[in-house]
From Swiss-Prot:
It comes from Oryza sativa subsp. japonica (Rice). Belongs to the glycosyl hydrolase 1 family. A beta-D-glucoside binds at residues 45, 146, 191-192, 331, 400, 447, 454-455, 463. Disulfide bonds join 211-214. The gene is BGLU38. This is Beta-glucosidase 38. Glycans are attached at residues 73, 77, 310, 341, 408. GO terms for molecular function: beta-D-fucosidase activity; beta-galactosidase activity; beta-glucosidase activity. The keyword Protein biosynthesis does not apply. The active site is at residues 192, 400.
Amino acid sequence: MNMPLLLLIAIVVVSLSHGNGEQTDLTRETFPAGFVFGTASSAYQVEGNALQYGRGPCIWDTFLMQPGVTPDNSTANVTVDEYHRYMDDVDNMVRVGFDAYRFSISWSRIFPSGLGKINKDGVDYYHRLIDYMLANNIIPYVVLYHYDLPQVLHDQYKGWLHPRIVRDFVRFADFCFKTYGHKVKNWFTINEPRMMANHGYGDGFFPPGRCTGCQPGGNSATEPYIAAHNLLLSHAAAVRTYRDKYQAIQKGKIGILLDFVWYEPLTDKEEDHAAAHRAREFTLGWYLHPITYGHYPETMQNAVKERLPNFTREQSEMIKGSADYIAINHYTTYYVSHHVNKTSISYLNDWDVKISYERNGVPIGKQAYSNWLYVVPWGIYKAVMHVKEKYKDPIIIIGENGIDQPGNETLPGALYDFFRIQYFDQYLHELKRAIKDGARVTGYFAWSLLDNFEWRLGFTSKFGIVYVDRSTFTRYPKDSTRWFRKMIKSEV
């Protein structure tokens, strides 16, 4: 008997005797009929084969060439090799009982040069993935853009800082609609545009690493707003293309994924309530207000003034109503209080808030492995109800929700993720409460399927419900997958 098989037997035996407290009163039947349970990933984090099979470089490939960008100096050149092992991953979804898989298409795998010559290997890969999903009754939810701009477009015209990006993104989107739209009925244009605008152009934490004082250059007072403006226009123009050319025939839907931390006032002071309002407007409202009402929030207009770009009348009309559903990526909640910091002008300082993780010495919630993530289940209820009440009661999808563990945990201990089971159970209870109170939530995607490459944290942080042995790429489902199976399939 070989060692991998012996290890697998040991894991199964220990797991069965581990007593992981998986009981829950949640079942599929406690959610509305047709509610979609799924899991999620992104191309850059799971595919690997970064410069193989015709794929061109993206801005993350270039960014990660610098030593020390990730704590473990890891890259996503190989990551968890879903490019070759997508069948294993879909099979695991089927075993759990998931209805859907949210994944992204790598722009530079389809168009290595941003546009122009098509990479047939890349096109064929996504056909294989989608076809295998459909053959196994897993619904594709496809994201067109998840952080991974083709490097050539940044080199040519600074990417999201230039209006030309709108035209190029629409051409890429149009190709995807035309090529996959007869099989894909659920689209998202862009994942977390705020994160790209802030980290790519505000503090330099993400590629292209631009900010005031950053080595590549930049202006933290203006560039985040310019990038966000072009991201919004790209989203809206892609939605218009889909609706004008494809939606009536393909009968699909299209939306956007927006990150949303819930911001709770630190005290009952009026100024802290105003600070929490500003924080929500400068994050979710930055994108969802234009999509709902056709213009930026007045809070931002008053604070940012001439640094905030304006929409033309035509652009405003194009953006307003440019989503069939809104996906919210929600993980955590913070306290905020009023605080003016004018030592420098930047997107983050424009909020005039201070973020806190405790009140009167009491933490807002238990901290996960990541120092930004606290377990605050009631935050998802407030976040969802805020979207319902402020943005005309849209159809809502929870696009991401999850918690991480240290990346150095190994087998079999890494499989015993009771803390993750507790997180999912508590957050789903609060989500169910929001649905009961009238929120039109139609789906929930757990982040993430796999222990994959976690951006600036490399492999030191793991959000997956499936452990991946990176020496063999063997997948080992964690206890949380069994919890989901019992909940979704209503098993005793």
